Amino acid sequence: MSNRNLRSSTNSEFSEGQHQTPSSDSSGHGEDQPQASPGPNKKSHTPKKNISKGAVLHEKPMTVMVLTATEPFNYKEGKENMFHATVATESQYYRVKVFNMDLKEKFTENKFITISKYFNSSGILEINETATVSEAAPNQIIEVPKNIIRSAKETLKISKIKELDSGTLIYGVFAVEKKKVNDKSITFKIKDNEDNIKVVWDKKQHNINYEKGDKLQLFSFHLRKGNGKPILHSGNHSFIKGEKLLKESFEGDGYHKGPKQVVALKATKLFTYDSIKSKKMFHATVATDTEFFRVMVFEENLEKKFIPGNTIALSDYFGMYGSLAIHEYSSVSEVKSQNKEDSSSSDERLIEHLKICDLHLQTKERLVDGEFKVYRKSTGNNCICYGIWDDTGAMKVVVSGQLTSVNCEIGNTIRLVCFELTSNADEWFLRSTRYSYMEVIMPEK
């Protein structure tokens, strides 16, 4: 990589509610037994098909906002269908098991619905054919606080999961560290930034194909503590929604006719990279089904094309340092997507990010994007030197030019885009280039 060309002339469903209190059947084999606790508001003839043992009937209507819903899937070895959902009121959110496939359309994201005659099993709502679900009337619409929605998306730390009671149902999003396939089951070791735990998936339910680095979203897994070692085990209602890790692809230098059809994942803000000529640009990340590309966009009027979720076709672009460069003669056109998931949470798709330990093992210069914590800051001659770290190590970053005006302090989390990985003697470090972008990530309120 040419330093001369790169350098400027001045030189990316779950908290405590992610789990639930222990189910009445901690083994996971009786969650669909047709029993319910008696109560003054219950009718003895109410059918309890598919409802968990000990579930309590609630006849009073409750208005909720639908946050998410999975696709229907087979359980009981393919004999029955169900899907999982997450809903919220003004004060809390709930995990929901829905056994009536006629209700799938009602459980559409952001839709307000009123439910009654549902069951509550240890904090999880269960809805079968006897429940009543209808669209909420205008005067029934509720306002769900952002912190409730945010909490529903958070994942409880594995270290905290291990402290819960045996039988607790676990929901969460985790990365795959290892995978082992047996005759009757698939065993994963999943991890977060601090810990790991084993997950056992019964192959009678679904044969899933996810590997190291992929992301798994677990629904209704049972925490077991046999022999004193916690594991997560699938039950009758368990479901896994996976996401394959997108590998970075590098475009060869020079002109490319195209078209290349991709989905926009995310984009930076527009920024000035040449203050003398007042030239602006932005960076974007786009992806196919299996790989992602970094894009440098030098045309201001193309910002709306790169809205996350948009399917676009790129033509007449250039390969530049492995990235795609879009200039005034390039063509970016919107394409009507045939994939419903393209426009759903596309900016959250899992892409491969190099950790600092990986950067130290590189053998040649390259461009780097990433988010890191700042632990050190010092000011030099026309530059600022930062010390950054992640959970694998630390590295030096040298910032010069316009990026020295970014208000970044020790303790901040920063996003670096298009920084050059280079070396001085036997030390690898990052430095800003002509096209680098840097911003401080503010915590959500």
Curated annotation (Swiss-Prot):
Effect on the protein upon substituting residue 166 to A: Strongly reduces affinity for DNA
A Pfam family: HIN
Induction line: By beta interferon. By IL6 in splenocytes (at protein level).
Residue ranges of domain HIN-200 in the record: 46-243, 244-441
PTM note: Phosphorylated.
Major subcellular location class: cytoplasm
SUPFAM superfamilies to which the protein is assigned, alphabetical: HIN-2000 domain-like
Chain intervals for the UniProt region annotation (Disordered): 1-57
Reported impact of residue 227 to A: Strongly reduces affinity for DNA
Record keywords, A-Z: Cytoplasm, DNA-binding, Immunity, Inflammatory response, Innate immunity, Nucleus, Phosphoprotein, Repeat
Subcellular location: Cytoplasm; Nucleus
Annotated region (Required for homomultimerization), positions in chain: 82-89, 281-288
Oligomer and partners: Homomultimer; homotetramerizes (via HIN-200 domain 2), enhancing affinity for double-stranded DNA (dsDNA). Interacts (via HIN-200 domain 2) with AIM2 (via HIN-200 domain); preventing activation of the AIM2 inflammasome. Binds to several transcription factors, including NF-kappa-B p50 (NFKB1) and p65 (RELA), FOS, JUN, E2F1, E2F4, MYOD1 and myogenin. Also binds TP53/p53, the hypophosphorylated, growth-inhibitory form of the retinoblastoma protein and the p53-binding protein 1 (TP53BP1).
Family: Belongs to the HIN-200 family.
Protein name: Interferon-activable protein 202
Source organism (scientific name): Mus musculus
